[in-house]
Regions:
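Short, glycine/small-hydrophobic-rich surface segments
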Residues: 52-86
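Membrane-proximal N-terminal amphipathic helix
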Residues: 36-61
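Structured, soluble extracytoplasmic/luminal domains of envelope-associated proteins
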Residues: 83-121
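Short, intrinsically disordered/low-complexity patches at protein termini
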Residues: 5-7, 61-62, 131
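Short, surface-exposed interaction loops/tails
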Residues: 105-149
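N-terminal single-pass transmembrane signal-anchor helix
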Residues: 1-33
């Protein structure tokens, strides 16, 4: 009987240690998942910028006027796979792109309570945007870290 009690205690300590390690591992995996999602957003934004540059270079050679729309997705041929369209407010879905028609911004809603916002800029404002061409560029405005419902 005396040997059973220490074994139960050792087992309880082992379970507690494994539980603490599991919680630490889960939080580390969440941070990695957030980093991967941020990298995917940056990659998609870069692809949109490249398509904008391609479209603008084509327009510069052929001529014609620029679209009036402030939605960069309307300027390009290939929209992001998870693009919901032009909306007046934030959608319920997460991990999606949409154009906020009130703020005139392209938005990505992260799965982890954040948003990345981009704005199509023109004229003198575009001069400070990396990758701008003929006075047009896509600028990352902010990453909003808040609870968005």
């Amino acid at each position: 009987m005396d040997t059973i009690r220490p074994r139960k205690f050792e087992f309880a300590v082992l379970v507690a240690i494994i539980g603490i390690l599991a919680v630490g591992l889960m939080s580390a995996l969440d941070r990695v998942r957030e980093s991967f999602e941020e990298a995917a957003v940056q990659s998609e934004a870069a692809a949109i910028r490249v398509e904008l540059l391609d479209w603008l270079a084509h327009r510069e050679i052929i001529g014609g006027k620029l679209p009036e729309s402030r939605n960069p997705i309307r300027w390009i041929a290939q929209q992001p796979e998870n693009y919901l369209g032009e909306l007046d407010g934030a959608p319920k879905e997460r991990g999606v792109w949409y154009f906020d028609s009130r703020r005139q911004e392209l938005v990505y809603r992260f799965r982890f309570e954040r948003e990345a916002r981009f704005r199509l800029v023109r004229g003198a404002e575009a001069a400070s945007v990396p990758g701008s061409f003929v006075g047009v560029g896509l600028r990352r405005i902010e990453v909003v870290s808040k609870t968005v419902k």
